[in-house]
């Protein structure tokens, strides 16, 4: 079988000390590895110098906003419970939600949280997932009311590879400066590097567009089948404004900031769907057909995200660049450094 389709072909070894537990401060001082595909050139610089390398292009950002999706509570017996909200079931008659619960629970069990928030376990699903209903003062909470309450009592859901509790600084650090549409349970991390000053400077030379893709917990789901074509990609809600669609439909060069932007642009390029659910899986055998350039962080081995990067530059080239980044001690994952692919 073609090696590009084998999960084991996307593996690499990373020392724990290269996993960033906190962002660089100031954030635009993060490092940036630039790879020019046409000339096969590599540059090592800092993120604040991004504009020095950008060609004439429109820049697309994901303006999703991370929910405080993690809450801690108790069972009636007093046992501790941790609930991680994933997403609402949009097609259900009553407001129901998908959540991951740490701790053994039964169907119809009631769980208790701060501010008189109660959760009823409606259904036990696979992979530790549960269908749940939220109540406060015995009234069912819809998505909007729940998100407002979580903003008071919830915690920022840091990724599983950041081995610490969330802190006050994460409220700002794990949210992009243009985040406005609540619904993500993970940040579109390439966006986290941008400061207001950088954005202002970019606007002077580039057209900026926003789209929304609510990053789901599935972004951390590991690929378990050796033939990656058998992997079932998670589905995430997206919305693209008309003006952004017109740019995608044009011949204008596009820089996508982050893998979520890339998947949304490429889904639209294939389907002409402006609003719905995206489950597009990009890899070297299913490469991009519209987006020209990519700005992204360094991703986990064997993840759909490293496969997406490989779809742009080829698997072997991607692994070579990761090997170089490790040698040069770049910082990896959500709070880590960035890579620009031209």
Swiss-Prot record:
Protein name: S-adenosylmethionine:tRNA ribosyltransferase-isomerase
Record field: catalytic activity: 7-aminomethyl-7-carbaguanosine(34) in tRNA + S-adenosyl-L-methionine = epoxyqueuosine(34) in tRNA + adenine + L-methionine + 2 H(+)
Protein's GO biological process: queuosine biosynthetic process; tRNA wobble guanine modification
Subunit structure of this chain's protein: Monomer.
Metabolic or biological pathway, per its Swiss-Prot or TrEMBL entry: tRNA modification; tRNA-queuosine biosynthesis
Keywords carried by this UniProt record: Cytoplasm, Queuosine biosynthesis, S-adenosyl-L-methionine, Transferase
Biological role: Transfers and isomerizes the ribose moiety from AdoMet to the 7-aminomethyl group of 7-deazaguanine (preQ1-tRNA) to give epoxyqueuosine (oQ-tRNA).
EC number: 2.4.99.17
Keyword Membrane: no
Keyword Transferase tagged: yes
Main location: cytoplasm
NCBIfam families: PRK00147.1 (NF001140), queA (TIGR00113)
GO terms for cellular component: cytoplasm
Gene Ontology MF: a single term: S-adenosylmethionine:tRNA ribosyltransferase-isomerase activity
InterPro entries linked to this entry: QueA, QueA_dom1, QueA_dom2, QueA_sf
Lineage: Bacteria, Pseudomonadati, Campylobacterota, Epsilonproteobacteria, Campylobacterales
Compartments where located: Cytoplasm
């Amino acid at each position: 079988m073609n090696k590009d389709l084998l999960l084991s072909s996307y593996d690499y070894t990373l020392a724990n000390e290269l996993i960033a537990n906190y962002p660089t401060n100031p954030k635009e001082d993060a490092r940036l590895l630039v790879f020019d595909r046409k000339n096969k050139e590599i540059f090592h610089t800092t993120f604040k110098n991004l504009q020095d390398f950008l060609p004439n292009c429109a820049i697309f950002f994901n303006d999703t906003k991370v929910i405080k999706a993690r809450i801690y509570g108790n069972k009636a017996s007093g046992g501790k419970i941790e609930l991680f909200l994933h997403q609402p079931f949009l097609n259900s008659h009553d407001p129901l939600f998908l959540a991951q619960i740490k701790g053994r629970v039964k169907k119809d069990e009631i769980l208790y949280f701060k501010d008189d928030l109660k959760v009823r376990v409606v259904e036990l699903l696979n992979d530790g997932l549960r269908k749940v209903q939220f109540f406060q003062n015995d009234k069912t909470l819809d998505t909007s009311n729940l998100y407002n309450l979580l903003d008071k009592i919830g915690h920022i859901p840091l990724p599983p590879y950041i081995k610490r509790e969330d802190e006050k600084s994460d409220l700002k650090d794990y949210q992009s400066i243009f985040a406005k549409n609540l619904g993500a349970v993970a940040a579109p991390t390439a966006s986290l590097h941008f400061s207001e000053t950088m954005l202002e400077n970019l606007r002077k030379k580039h057209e900026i567009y926003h789209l929304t893709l609510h990053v789901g917990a599935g972004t951390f789901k590991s690929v378990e089948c050796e033939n990656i074509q058998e992997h079932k990609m998670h589905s995430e809600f997206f919305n693209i404004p008309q003006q952004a669609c017109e740019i995608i439909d044009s011949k204008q060069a596009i820089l996508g900031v982050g893998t979520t932007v890339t998947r949304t642009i490429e889904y639209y390029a294939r389907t002409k769907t402006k609003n719905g659910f995206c489950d597009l899986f990009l890899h070297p055998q299913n490469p991009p057909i519209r987006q020209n350039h990519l700005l992204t962080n360094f991703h986990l081995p064997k993840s759909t995200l490293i496969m997406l990067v490989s779809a742009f530059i080829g698997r072997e080239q991607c692994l070579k660049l990761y090997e170089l980044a490790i040698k040069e001690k770049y910082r990896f994952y959500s709070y880590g450094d960035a890579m620009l692919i031209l």
